[in-house]
């Protein structure tokens, strides 16, 4: 299969190139860029020397429509809104890693992203690519809205409770931490070494754009769920997300009941690993992989549930899940090209 990637020079795009360089069904991978066209890709990314030595090509729809079968869009918000309708008209399958197609209500997207939404018909056609929870729709889709990094960790952590209608409608708190690669490759004051090193900070307080994405999915599973409290923090590490979630339940369950519920829910999900009781995951334990590791426990003193979910933000939170969706869309084993052991230590 001939594959295109727009945004191959960003961190998410680079991970796509790395994964697809050894994917058995990737016949050819064509890399497109709005800048740097003509440059040899591996010269800018020496770790891919011998694996991705092709030249970057300009984004030209007249050429693209004759070159590829599927396009991964790993560009910033706004690019997909412009390109996706053209790609769809050309009969090209699209997997979009930006947030442009995730929020079903255009007004809600514009409120949180502060930009014009994609055409509503395109948004409505897009299937939300949370692979473990939406397999049947993904298998039939031609357009995928790949979930955000925080929503992936949070929704996988809360899905077993939400799908059983067990979440307290007014009490869901998410405290999430991410590595700096989630901010992208472009330099900024907030990601400058001297600003980030030996530091730990909260950002986008009460206005993070992943909030409505999380709420949208939760309300599909458990209608009537109220607004959540979501806080994001930046920590001085390169990769990884840890989402810690606190909630109350609508019925009485023991710690053993909860662990059994999660274990059964994900028993057929290769990439979600529910930890043994009393063992809590660390970001290092999923580094470089497509795994999501989850722990769940009950505080009997407060009767509150704590769920801990960790992912690699560039893999399960972006490129890895995109390739997982690529596999599902084509009827292949979802693990194809993704059986990458976490890098440790």
UniProtKB/Swiss-Prot annotation:
CDD domains: AGPR_1_C, AGPR_1_N. It is found in: Cytoplasm. One of its GO terms (biological process) is L-arginine biosynthetic process. It is an enzyme of class 1 (oxidoreductase). The keyword Cytoplasm applies. It catalyses: N-acetyl-L-glutamate 5-semialdehyde + phosphate + NADP(+) = N-acetyl-L-glutamyl 5-phosphate + NADPH + H(+). It holds the Pfam family Semialdhyde_dhC_1. The active site is at 149. Gene3D superfamilies: Dihydrodipicolinate Reductase, domain 2, NAD(P)-binding Rossmann-like Domain. The keyword Amino-acid biosynthesis applies. One of its GO terms (cellular component) is cytoplasm. Its EC number is 1.2.1.38. Pathway: Amino-acid biosynthesis; L-arginine biosynthesis; N(2)-acetyl-L-ornithine from L-glutamate: step 3/4. Keywords: Amino-acid biosynthesis, Arginine biosynthesis, Cytoplasm, NADP, Oxidoreductase. Its main location: cytoplasm. GO terms for molecular function: N-acetyl-gamma-glutamyl-phosphate reductase activity; NAD binding; NADP+ binding. Catalyzes the NADPH-dependent reduction of N-acetyl-5-glutamyl phosphate to yield N-acetyl-L-glutamate 5-semialdehyde. Belongs to the NAGSA dehydrogenase family. Type 1 subfamily. NCBIfam families: argC (TIGR01850). This is N-acetyl-gamma-glutamyl-phosphate reductase. The gene is argC.
């Amino acid at each position: 299969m001939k594959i295109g990637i727009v945004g191959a020079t960003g961190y998410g795009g680079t991970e796509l190139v790395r994964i697809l360089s050894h994917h058995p069904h990737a016949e050819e991978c064509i890399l497109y860029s709005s800048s740097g066209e003509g440059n040899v890709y591996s010269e800018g990314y020496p770790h891919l020397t011998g694996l991705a030595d092709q030249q970057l090509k300009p984004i030209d729809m007249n050429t693209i429509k004759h070159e590829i079968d599927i396009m991964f869009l790993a560009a910033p918000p706004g690019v997909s809104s412009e390109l996706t309708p053209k790609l769809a008209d050309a009969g090209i399958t699209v997997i979009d890693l930006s947030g442009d197609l995730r929020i079903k209500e255009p007004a809600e997207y514009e409120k949180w992203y502060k930009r014009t939404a994609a055409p509503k018909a395109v948004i409505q056609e897009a299937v939300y690519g949370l692979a473990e929870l939406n397999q049947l729709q993904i298998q039939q889709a031609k357009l995928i809205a790949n979930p955000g990094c925080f929503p992936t960790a949070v929704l996988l952590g809360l899905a077993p409770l939400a799908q059983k209608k067990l979440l307290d409608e007014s009490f869901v708190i998410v405290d999430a931490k991410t590595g700096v690669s989630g901010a992208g490759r472009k330099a900024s004051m907030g990601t400058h070494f001297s600003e980030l090193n030996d530091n730990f900070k909260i950002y986008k307080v009460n206005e993070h754009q992943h909030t409505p994405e999380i709420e949208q999915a939760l309300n599909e599973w458990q209608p009537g769920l109220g607004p959540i409290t979501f806080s994001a923090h930046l920590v001085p590490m390169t990769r990884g997300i840890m989402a810690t979630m606190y909630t109350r339940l609508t019925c009485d369950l023991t710690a053993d009941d909860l662990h059994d519920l999660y274990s059964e829910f994900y028993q057929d999900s290769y990439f979600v690993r529910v930890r043994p009781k009393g063992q809590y995951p660390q970001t290092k334990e999923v580094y470089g992989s497509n795994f999501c590791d989850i722990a769940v426990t009950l505080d009997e003193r407060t009767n509150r549930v704590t769920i801990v979910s960790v992912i690699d933000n560039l893999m399960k939170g972006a490129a890895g899940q995109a390739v997982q969706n690529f596999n599902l869309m084509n009827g292949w084993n979802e693990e194809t090209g993704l059986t990458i052991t976490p890098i440790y230590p």
